């Protein structure tokens, strides 16, 4: 009975406790960035030319910052799709200060405050670099035709907290003309995030705005935009976002309104009770605002709840990433 109680308690809180104590595994590779270094995992050594790589999959971890777990999920998905040799999987790791302390990591490694990396906040040391600018830097490296002469497309995918990163990045990033010039496509796969950034004050759940004063602030809305957005107006950001090629990948069983990792803030609750309905509400909102020409789609994954590995290795996940 005591063991059962410990297990039940752990389901509710051990993940968060582990995250506060620092991530277990630090990714082994490094990407130099403006006087600092990003920790990341790679499925192939990109320090040398990779003439056989046709697709790069940038896969973003969730709040536990377990980048190596997501790297392995990406590799498994590529293997099941028969595309291991032609796919470079890249898993950036957004460390925080507890990770640095736990592993006694060097000062050069970039780290963020708490979960601020999800919203594009700048790193706190050794340089102030937005987590979204990190994705820009990875894309910039992939533009190099000497290293990647056969690259055809880049897919940026994330699950849970990582999906929040991908959704907000797709919204706040500008165009990538060098990718376009090189003939390299860019797609996004957003899997089971807790929340989305809306374009205006409308929300699918009725509420009293006075009781939730930050409901329309970034990262839930477009008030108080981050510096990374570069002074663009909400209208400009929306117009850019709806031109992106995006797949919203939702687990049909991700329906627990009390899931321990679900965002239960009032700003998130205005979007729906659980992740599946929040995703449907947001996609319906997009279609109403842009009934013509939307290059986006919603795909449900049967029998899967809040599980990143099962989402990306499912037939629907493989089709979204490797179509």
Name each model-derived stretch:
Residues 16-56, 64, 68-88, 116-133, ...:
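A domain-start/cap signature at the N-terminus of enzymes
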Residues 57-62, 91, 248:
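Structural cue for short, hydrophobic secondary-structure segments
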Residues 61-65, 194:
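Active-site glycine-rich loops that stabilize anionic/oxyanionic intermediates
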Residues 84-99:
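Conserved alpha/beta-hydrolase
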Residues 95-129, 261:
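Cap/lid segment of the alpha/beta-hydrolase catalytic domain
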Residues 132-152:
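Conserved acidic catalytic loop of the alpha/beta-hydrolase fold
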Residues 181-280, 284-288:
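The feature captures the conserved acid-bearing segment of alpha/beta-hydrolase catalytic domains
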Residues 249, 280-323:
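C-terminal catalytic histidine-bearing segment of alpha/beta-hydrolase fold enzymes
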């Amino acid at each position: 009975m005591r063991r059962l109680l410990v297990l039940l308690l752990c389901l509710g809180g051990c993940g968060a406790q582990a995250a506060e104590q620092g991530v277990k595994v630090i990714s082994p590779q490094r990407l130099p960035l403006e006087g600092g270094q990003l920790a990341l995992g790679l499925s192939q050594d990109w320090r040398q030319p990779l003439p056989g790589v046709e697709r790069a999959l940038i896969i973003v971890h969730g709040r536990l910052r377990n980048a190596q777990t997501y790297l392995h999920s990406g590799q498994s998905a590529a293997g099941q799709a028969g595309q291991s040799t032609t796919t470079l999987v890249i898993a950036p790791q957004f460390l925080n200060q507890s990770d640095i302390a736990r592993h006694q990591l060097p000062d050069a490694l970039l780290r963020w405050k708490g979960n601020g990396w999800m919203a594009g906040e700048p790193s706190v040391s050794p340089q102030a670099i937005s987590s979204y600018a990190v994705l820009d830097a990875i894309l910039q490296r992939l533009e190099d035709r000497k290293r990647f002469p056969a690259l055809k497309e880049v897919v940026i995918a994330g699950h849970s907290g990582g999906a929040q990163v991908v959704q907000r990045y797709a919204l706040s990033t500008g165009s990538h003309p060098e990718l376009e010039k090189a003939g390299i496509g860019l797609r996004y796969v957003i899997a089971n995030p807790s929340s989305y950034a809306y374009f205006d004050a409308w929300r699918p759940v009725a509420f009293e705005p006075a009781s939730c004063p930050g409901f329309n602030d970034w990262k839930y809305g477009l008030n108080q935009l981050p510096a990374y957005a570069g002074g663009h107006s909400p209208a400009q950001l929306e117009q850019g976002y709806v031109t992106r090629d995006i797949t919203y990948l939702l687990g049909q069983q991700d329906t627990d309104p009390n899931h321990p990792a679900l965002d239960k803030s009032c700003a998130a609750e205005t979007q729906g009770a659980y992740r599946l309905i929040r995703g449907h509400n947001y996609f319906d909102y997009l279609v109403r605002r842009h009934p013509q020409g939307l290059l986006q789609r919603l795909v449900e994954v049967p029998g899967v709840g809040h599980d990143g590995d099962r989402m990306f290795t499912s037939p629907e996940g493989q089709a979204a990433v490797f179509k």
